[in-house]
Regions:
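Conserved alpha/beta-domain cores
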Residues: 1-165
Length: 165
């Protein structure tokens, strides 16, 4: 067992034992990692990978096209990247404003099925974090749910760190 497997297996085992079958999954954040590292983790059974940058992800996707992987965009999404995000990702976890929704819906190829989206909510009103205000989340959810090529799957939020807890 190599070092990667030694770190990965206990994590996956703990996840499986803590949740009913299929109730929780692991998205391995592969941003800044080379395609070879993604391939190595895929060989251990990991299928979902998270990327921050559309262009970096597209290069990896081309290099790893022979693998059946699920790609998540976890970084901020600019409107000029919606076309590539809608066409090449399975999930966009960082929808933080209404302007992105019709762009993603329009650019999603019908043959790929609906694009899974998470609405990013800035729950602590941190200036350094992206996300819509909590009070705007329901209106954003209603807009997302009305679009046929998007599948609203939930929320994504990163709470403010509390080192004393």
């Amino acid at each position: 067992m190599d070092a990667l497997e030694a770190r990965y297996r206990p994590l996956v085992d703990a996840l499986r034992s803590a949740s009913p079958a299929g109730a929780a999954g692991l998205v391995a954040v592969s941003k800044t990692q080379p395609a070879g590292a993604v391939r190595a983790l895929a060989a251990l059974g990991q299928r979902a990978f998270g990327e921050n940058y559309v262009q970096e992800a597209l290069a990896k996707q081309r290099e790893l096209a022979d693998l059946d992987l699920e790609w998540h965009l976890i970084g901020p999404l600019q409107s000029n990247k919606c076309r590539e995000a809608a066409r090449h990702f399975d999930w966009v976890q960082s929808v933080d404003r209404a302007k992105l929704l019709p762009l993603l819906d329009r650019e999603r190829p019908a043959e790929r099925g609906p694009l899974n989206v998470l609405l990013q909510v800035n729950i602590d009103d941190e200036p350094s974090k992206s996300g819509c205000a909590p009070g705007d989340a329901m209106a954003l959810a209603d807009e997302a749910a009305a679009l046929p090529r998007l599948r609203l799957r939930g929320l994504m939020a990163i709470p403010e760190p509390h080192p004393d807890e």
